[in-house]
């Protein structure tokens, strides 16, 4: 890959600048960047033939309004040549994610999707929800559109197949069945209520169910019930009858169940008023595993094929694509996108725009959902903009804030202290930009709320000053809301003055004398506190912001506290990660038992080599 960079800051912007680059380009594939007079990237694009693509921009006419504006602002260009067009597409999407150019389509929601994992690193496999890298041993099923969709399916699997969901440590410590056994959601393998062979059969049935082979599962259960009845094992027959009934209820409660589509993502885009909604339905094993809507950033003039092509490349950047992707509109480069996705999946991925039949109905359903989601979002956005304008008026800001950061701390007498930051703006809560701060300084141990707030804001703004000192991105806040009164406001003022940040307004939100919601007092530096009318929509808006920050901080504190409670000496041993820790605890039952074990006993644990066993033994015995 070659990098040819040219700086055009001293030449005029527009067609003349672009024309000047043509003589330096050949017909190689690659990626180009268009920069403005301040060297900010306006646009990143790919090309099969760089010279041909750039010559299109050099034409004085025939461009959409969006492209014409971009050309007028272009002061310089940068080029990267690649070996193939597929490589250029991959590089283009990586640069778009990294640089976030103003004129590109950008997918803003990059959250991972949950899966169901049947973990098989234990004689009695465990059923659980899983996110992230598929590094654990077992069978994965997904993706599901949301945690709620996974939880519903897990609940169904427990009802029908009676699989355990407890941790290995809990499993090993049980001496009698838990409540899940009593309510017929688990077969209690922890205390030997089900033989290993029978439990393995339950696991097999659950896997067949998740693979869409429900008819076979139902037939197997019916055969077992008949056999139990003939053998006069009436209690077992009744239990099997209940499982068949539960399975029938599960099948009837499932929504979209396409017969002719075993595995696909159905993706539709709706474009209106310069905004876009992309709706994705996940179909696996002939079942719909939920849907998710996305609102990519698009410039005025962007069209459906461009939006879908950018979405596909960015969405599947860290997700395995299914065998088939059904689209509402054709993309500009279907062969290229299909090749890229096939390379990522390690198998053939087909793109299609169905015109009739069941597949077309699935796409139409996704398109209808995209249309309705965008209408709701536009209505919510109008309300949000009115609230932001009201906030600016109430707090005497120069303009309606586009980025509000709200801060809160959470701890119990200084233990497991955490600071939380949430972000809100015209599009509502921006959850992908929420942050947690583990309190490192003495303020946490002392339970000093003012000191904690100083630490959190110091870390936040020192990073901003380091990464974006000229404030060229939208990472800088227009308003800070702090949970607290005059003391917190003084602490914030002190730290911002020390950092030289004197133009970011901040407000302290205190609950007032009675500490009742609705009687909040607002504090600004050097001014007496003031209040808003009880029925003022802005007051409710600020309460929502404060409560969300409180929820986020408390959640972070609880997670940190839970982690501290579950910590064991095994966490301190070099080379013992999560998988080895699970294996050791499952084998020995407790960290104390691991500490007492000899090297031969440790070697008997799966994944523990003789060298690692010696290291573990030496750690506990001081050798």
Curated annotation (Swiss-Prot):
Entries under PROSITE patterns matching the protein: GIY_YIG, UVR, UVRC
Species of provenance: Cereibacter sphaeroides (strain ATCC 17023 / DSM 158 / JCM 6121 / CCUG 31486 / LMG 2827 / NBRC 12203 / NCIMB 8253 / ATH 2.4.1.)
UniProt protein name: UvrABC system protein C
Superkingdom as given in the UniProt entry: Bacteria
GIY-YIG domain ranges (all copies): 27-105
GO biological process: nucleotide-excision repair; SOS response
HAMAP family assigned to the protein according to its UniProt record, in alphabetical order: UvrC (MF_00203)
Disulfide bonds: none
Domain UVR stretches: 215-250
Keyword DNA damage included in the entry's annotation: yes
Gene: uvrC
